[in-house]
Amino acid sequence: MTMRRLVLVLVPAVLLCAYAVRAEKEDLKSGPQAGDNLPGPLLSIVAYSDEPSLVGKKLDLTERYGQDPVILVFAREMTKPLTDLVRKLDAEVAKRKSAKLRAIVVILSDDDALEQNLKDFAAKDGIKNFNLAFMEPAGPKHYKLSKEADVTVLLYKRQKVEANHAFKKGELNEKGVEKIVADVPKIASKR
């Protein structure tokens, strides 16, 4: 085979592989998608809350906040990008108190030190407008969270998902955080 024919065969093959990898990354689905209703209760143990009376209790915060707009984050661990996301969303919630915007992070882990670590994080970073909770690593089965997703973010209002963002391990970055923050107006409008 001549070099020219080899190039004509290899270049399209490489481009096809690159497209397939990109499509696979974009197709990560985790949890209910935009347009879906929340699938039901979400019982988790509250480690930190803007409502101190909730701390230490096993609650369904999705039921508690009813029809209010909520940013619900499921994560497998507290990473630097996740803490950056929490800080930015904490500021968004503070700006949108009149819309009754709420935010919940549920860490999916059975780490014995997690509850204290979440309390320490909230105190150290001055988190004021958030609920930090945890539950078993598998997460709520009826939410159908992907095992491939390290972070799943649902933005919903009136129990209906308006936006969904899912990230594999190491994929949540500043650009992803900005996309999530840009979707907050979808749920935090006054109507």
Regions found by a protein language model. Give the residues of each.
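N-proximal helix/coil linker or "cap" segments that precede and/or mark the start of modular domains
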Residues: A20-Y48
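Bacterial N-terminal signal peptides
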Residues: V9-A18
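A short beta-strand-turn-helix
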Residues: L43-I71, A91
